[in-house]
Amino acid sequence: MSAQKPGLHPRNRHHSRYDLATLCQVNPELRQFLTLTPAGEQSVDFANPLAVKALNKALLAHFYAVANWDIPDGFLCPPVPGRADYIHHLADLLAEASGTIPANASILDIGVGANCIYPLIGVHEYGWRFTGSETSSQALSSAQAIISANPGLNRAIRLRRQKESGAIFNGIIHKNEQYDATLCNPPFHDSAAAARAGSERKRRNLGLNKDDALNFGGQQQELWCEGGEVAFIKKMIEESKGFAKQVMWFTSLVSRGENLPPLYRALTDVGAVKVVKKEMAQGQKQSRFIAWTFMNDEQRRRFVNRQR
């Protein structure tokens, strides 16, 4: 097991404060959502979901050449810098086999979401090809609309509906397909009540009353599942064994550090050859992802150099 110290990734484009003047030029809608902090500095009204969406539109257009992006009301509006960090750390993980980041990597995004955020960043930053899976037909339609509205993305991103209840890789990874890595932002609550309580905590932390608009929306499949994050990732680990020769690295975000021990035990049980934990940080927010493989060093080198 190896670990690496936290911090925003060096290649992340979002180290400095947002250049709001430039972002407002990119997306003039953002201007109406600017506010002043108690210190008198200009900021974005992060408690307003329309403001967060307008900021994301500007960031994706300015930094990632995604000119047309939108999501339906009620779906998660992800913070772009944190999502980019996962992609950059994943790139480093893929580079360890050959010493360079593969330019033609094939990545599977489990739960691509209405926002399609990971493929959008990964295609722009590294030229990777993505397959995105999703259980929700509405989320899939939204992601496809984003792909279709931006020239070139149709060649780089394809979407698949997960029709098998409770399945993660089964039904999505086809017989002769190979992926350099999978990624996933799993549902972290174990019930709708727990998800609501989480939103209440965020609301209180922002000093909002319960009627105020929130940017922490999300559909059921985005926020919770039976047994929560640990059960979901354990299921992923269990299924991954069946695709040990088709996928080099399986990865998943883990929202809470205390969830790691049962996941490590599950990885030992399925015979993972190597397990890696990557720590990430954005401001005060700490996050991490775990990665596991069933291939040894030599097998991973051969996998990276395979015919594509």
UniProtKB/Swiss-Prot annotation:
Query: Would you tell me the Gene Ontology cellular component terms?
Result: cytoplasm
Say yes or no: keyword rRNA processing present.
Answer: yes
Q: Where is this protein primarily located?
A: cytoplasm
Q: Give the molecular function GO annotations.
A: 23S rRNA (adenine(1618)-N(6))-methyltransferase activity
InterPro entries xrefs: METTL16/RlmF, rRNA_lsu_MeTfrase_F, SAM-dependent_MTases_sf
Q: Which reaction does it catalyse?
A: adenosine(1618) in 23S rRNA + S-adenosyl-L-methionine = N(6)-methyladenosine(1618) in 23S rRNA + S-adenosyl-L-homocysteine + H(+)
Q: Which GO terms describe its biological process?
A: rRNA base methylation
Give the subcellular location. Answer: Cytoplasm
The signal peptide stretch is: none
Top EC class, one word: transferase
EC number(s) for this protein?
Answer: 2.1.1.181
Q: Does the keyword Methyltransferase apply?
A: yes
Keywords tagged on the record: Cytoplasm, Methyltransferase, rRNA processing, S-adenosyl-L-methionine, Transferase
The family database entries (Gene3D superfamilies) matched by this protein are listed as: Vaccinia Virus protein VP39
Report disulfide bridges, numbered on this chain.
none
UniProt function note:
Specifically methylates the adenine in position 1618 of 23S rRNA.
The UniProt family comment states: Belongs to the methyltransferase superfamily. METTL16/RlmF family.
Q: Which NCBIfam families match?
A: PRK11727.1 (NF008725)
What is the protein's given name?
A: Ribosomal RNA large subunit methyltransferase F
Q: From which organism does this entry originate?
A: Escherichia coli O1:K1 / APEC
Q: Which gene encodes it?
A: rlmF
